[in-house]
Amino acid sequence: QALIVIDIQEGLVKENPFDTKNFIINTKAIIQHFRDQNIEVIFIRHSEDEGLLAMGSDNWQVYHELKPQENEKIFNKYYNSIFKDTELKEYLNRKNITDLTFVGMQVEFCIDTSVKVGFEYGYKITIVEDAISTFDNEHLPADKILSFYKEKIWRNRFAQLKTTKEILAVN
């Protein structure tokens, strides 16, 4: 089992994703819970050659409140999928990790793509539904994007969804 923390980076959090405060509070609680259980926590950083998430820039770093510990892996990606050209799948296979729990952003890009690719690869995926976020866009407000993906796309199809409270209740 592993917790995958997807794209919660300084530059994106500064842009105020939906319900930023609770998103970060819940994510911190989930990370701490997994650490307390000695379950692996893996961070994913979206990377660009230039722009908001230019590799090496301050905006590219994992959000400071979620600071990875020295023993925690960080994978950098250039695509919406956490698996494409990252060595993540090989790493998980080497460690016999088959159950993945996802927190992070953005729902309609990297979370959705990674859920579906992970499903195709045979991983059992849990999404912490109150520890994922996104932004309003020209078509839909963020809360509608969240509810659409949770209820119409993922639930009982590609992943199971649990709240932070439900995850924390498990010893």
Name each model-derived stretch.
Residues 1-2, 29-32, 52-171:
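Active-site-adjacent betaalpha module
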Residues 4-7:
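N-terminal nucleotide-binding beta1-loop-alpha1 segment
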Residues 9-15:
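Short acidic, Gly/Ser-rich segments with clustered Asp/Glu that frequently serve as metal-coordination loops
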Residues 17-46:
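A short alpha/beta connector and helix-capping loop motif
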